[in-house]
């Protein structure tokens, strides 16, 4: 026997028993976003490597250690997308969607990062991202946060997530803060671990969200980013907080929140849960007003967020919020000469008469007992039974699989009777 081939580590199958919960989540996400008037974009999962190095930052963990990069036959360096914003901006510039225009878009699909697989963190994972281009006020920042808050309510997890906010200011303000932070860290060089020492000169703001408790202890005395904010960023952040207060959305200002990608400025935010252990961030985003210009477009304000779908599925499972629509409503049982095609025609008739109904035909033969057992296994509510007599009389037996009651009806009236039961 040939050796079986396994899935790549950190890249998981979504099995038929798991997909209904995914479909429920994806449906809720699409419904909420659509309620705000946003339109879907679909971008390739493979992009030129320099798109991500320019957008995300050469010295970020994503670019340095986590990207799946390969050379194609033309010698071009290509990368499986590790996130969606850079590709969305590239598509907007390339297709002339951003210059002097307002765009509100969303996308959903797989992303790839070569990380150590663990609960809630995978090498292929799925994100839904929402991006707004052409608006620079705190009102649109607030709308995105309100959108996510609405989604949490729809999913029933709003009591299990909390919002953290910060403003990291303009590029100029952050450069001044960076100088002060490096000077502080150099005074405590003996406390820093190797990762923090490396980041100190390449990406010092990332030291602020270190998980090392010894480094965390000294950061209480570190310079405060809020003391270095430019007046415009301070005013923008105050406006955002006022809008969230008016909307009744609770939040905590976390001055160590900086996000892991270099393109952010001003507003940054994360939704965090305690339900998933160490992988607590389920959604994060912020402003990236310089990214469009950085990637070759005209200066365009922008803001967005992304949420990890695997982590949301894991949350729903952890909180036992897994009620999903059954995959089959009606099971068609047949036995006897010429009944198979009659059963298939009847199933089509029911599908046409009841929008959204799910009808499964039994294939493979077997007696009634075997077929009813299969109907129970797939979770059907009712069975339609066709034998030779029913086909001849143009009737069908409708069996309630929960109570066991069965009644014979004409095939013309069967759809209305099914609708009453499901």
Curated annotation (Swiss-Prot):
**UniProt GO cellular component terms:** cytoplasm
Which family, according to UniProt?
Answer: Belongs to the class-II aminoacyl-tRNA synthetase family.
Q: What NCBIfam families does the database record attribute to this sequence? A: hisS (TIGR00442)
Gene Ontology biological process terms in this record? histidyl-tRNA aminoacylation
GO molecular function terms here? ATP binding; histidine-tRNA ligase activity
Name the PANTHER family on file: HISTIDINE--TRNA LIGASE, MITOCHONDRIAL-RELATED, HISTIDYL-TRNA SYNTHETASE
Q: What is its EC number?
A: 6.1.1.21
Under catalytic activity, the entry for this protein gives: tRNA(His) + L-histidine + ATP = L-histidyl-tRNA(His) + AMP + diphosphate + H(+)
Which keywords, in A-to-Z order, does the entry hold? Answer: Aminoacyl-tRNA synthetase, ATP-binding, Cytoplasm, Ligase, Nucleotide-binding, Protein biosynthesis
Q: Name one Pfam family in it.
A: tRNA-synt_His
Q: What is this protein called?
A: Histidine--tRNA ligase
- Location in the cell: Cytoplasm
Q: What class of enzyme is it?
A: ligase
HAMAP family given in the database record:
His_tRNA_synth (MF_00127)
Question: How is the subunit organization of this protein annotated in UniProt?
Answer: Homodimer.
Question: Source species, please?
Answer: Vibrio vulnificus (strain YJ016)
Q: Which PROSITE patterns match?
A: AA_TRNA_LIGASE_II
């Amino acid at each position: 026997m040939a050796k079986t081939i396994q899935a790549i580590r950190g890249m998981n199958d979504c099995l038929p028993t798991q997909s209904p919960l995914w479909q429920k989540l994806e449906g809720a996400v699409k419904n909420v976003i659509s309620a705000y008037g946003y339109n879907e974009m679909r971008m390739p999962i493979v992009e030129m490597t320099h798109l991500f190095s320019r957008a995300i930052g050469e010295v970020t963990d994503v670019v340095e250690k986590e990207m799946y990069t390969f050379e194609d036959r033309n010698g071009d360096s290509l990368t499986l997308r590790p996130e969606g914003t850079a590709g969305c901006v590239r598509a907007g510039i390339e297709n002339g969607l951003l210059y002097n225009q307002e765009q509100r878009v969303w996308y959903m699909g797989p992303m790839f990062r070569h990380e150590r697989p663990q609960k809630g963190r995978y090498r292929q994972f799925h994100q839904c991202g929402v991006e707004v281009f052409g608006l620079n006020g705190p009102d649109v920042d607030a709308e995105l946060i309100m959108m996510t808050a609405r989604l949490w309510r729809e999913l029933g997890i709003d009591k299990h997530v909390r919002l953290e906010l910060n403003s990291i200011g303009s590029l100029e303000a952050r450069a001044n803060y960076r100088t002060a932070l490096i000077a502080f860290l150099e005074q405590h060089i003996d406390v820093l671990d190797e990762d923090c020492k490396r980041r100190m000169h390449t990406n010092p703001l990332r030291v602020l969200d270190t998980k090392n408790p010894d480094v965390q202890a000294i950061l209480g005395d570190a310079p405060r980013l809020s003391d270095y904010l430019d007046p415009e960023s301070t005013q923008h952040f105050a406006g955002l907080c006022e809008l969230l207060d008016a909307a009744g959305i609770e939040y905590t200002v976390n001055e160590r929140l900086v996000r892991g990608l270099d393109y952010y400025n001003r507003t940054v935010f994360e939704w965090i849960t305690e339900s998933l252990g160490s992988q607590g961030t389920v959604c994060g985003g912020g402003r990236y007003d310089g990214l469009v210009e950085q990637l070759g477009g005209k200066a365009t304000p922008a803001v967005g967020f992304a949420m990890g779908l695997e982590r949301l599925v894991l949350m729903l499972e952890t909180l036992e919020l897994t009620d999903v629509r059954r995959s089959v409503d009606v099971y068609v049982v047949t036995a006897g000469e010429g009944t198979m095609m009659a059963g298939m025609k009847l199933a089509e008739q029911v599908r046409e008469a009841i929008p959204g109904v799910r009808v499964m035909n039994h294939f493979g033969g077997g007696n009634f007992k075997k077929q009813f057992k299969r109907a129970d296994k797939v979770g059907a509510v009712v069975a339609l039974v066709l034998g030779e007599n029913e086909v001849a009389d143009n009737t069908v037996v409708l069996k309630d699989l929960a109570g066991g009651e069965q009644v014979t009806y004409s095939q013309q009236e069967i759809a209305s009777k099914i609708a009453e039961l499901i």
